[in-house]
């Protein structure tokens, strides 16, 4: 029987500017993959750099955690946006974190949308499709992380069609 493992995953890198949020220094050594905020709902370039370095030091898989451009609402407020805007938001954030990781000799492993973007996608599969399209265009090796209890068959179909 093959060895099975559970991926312990956490949202991290959500501090920005002078504001420290979360317990990244304590949490990251305990997890196997990290969803790192990419600047729209939380995080900033310095926090992203520090969080990536901490994850690498602890052998933790790097993931982009793109959200809607909503610092005030922490990315938890729904917005009326088009699929093209969602693609732009996700492209920008994955690209930023991908560059931060590359400068430290690492690559991204996964993408897990944040907050309202995730919740909007649960209700609208076209949003999942838009996210998967961007992921495939950036790096087909990226894994789309979703919450337990999601419609697995539908999400697998979208991911397979998009090549992620």
Residue ranges and their predicted role:
Residues 131-164:
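A contiguous pocket-lining binding segment that forms or flanks enzyme active sites
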Residues 36-41, 120-121, 141-149:
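Catalytic beta/alpha-barrel core
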Residues 71-105, 110:
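Glycine/small-residue-rich loop that forms an oxyanion/phosphate-binding "nest" at active or ligand-binding sites
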Residues 124-130:
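Charged helix-capping and loop-helix junction motifs
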Residues 16-49:
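A short alpha/beta connector and helix-capping loop motif
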Residues 6-10, 34-36, 62-66, 109-113, ...:
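Hydrophobic faces of well-ordered beta-strands that scaffold small-molecule active sites
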Residues 25-29, 50-63, 102-105, 136:
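Acidic (Asp/Glu)-rich catalytic clusters
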Residues 12, 54-81:
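Glycine-rich nucleotide/cofactor/substrate-binding loop typically near the N-terminus or early
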């Amino acid at each position: 029987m093959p060895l099975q493992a559970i991926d312990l995953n956490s949202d991290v890198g959500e501090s920005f500017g002078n504001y420290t949020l979360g317990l990244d220094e304590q949490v990251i050594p305990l997890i196997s993959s990290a969803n790192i905020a990419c600047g729209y709902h939380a995080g900033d370039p310095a926090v992203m750099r520090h969080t990536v370095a901490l994850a690498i030091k602890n052998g933790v898989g790097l993931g982009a955690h793109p959200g809607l451009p909503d610092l005030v609402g922490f990315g938890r407020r729904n917005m009326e946006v088009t699929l093209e805007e969602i693609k732009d938001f996700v492209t920008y954030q994955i690209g930023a974190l991908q560059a931060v990781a590359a400068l430290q000799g690492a690559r991204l492993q996964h993408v897990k949308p944040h907050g309202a973007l995730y919740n909007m996608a649960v209700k609208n599969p076209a949003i999942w499709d838009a996210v998967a399209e961007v992921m495939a265009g950036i790096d087909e090796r990226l894994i789309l992380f979703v919450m337990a209890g999601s419609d697995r068959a539908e999400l697998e179909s979208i991911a397979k069609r998009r090549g992620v």
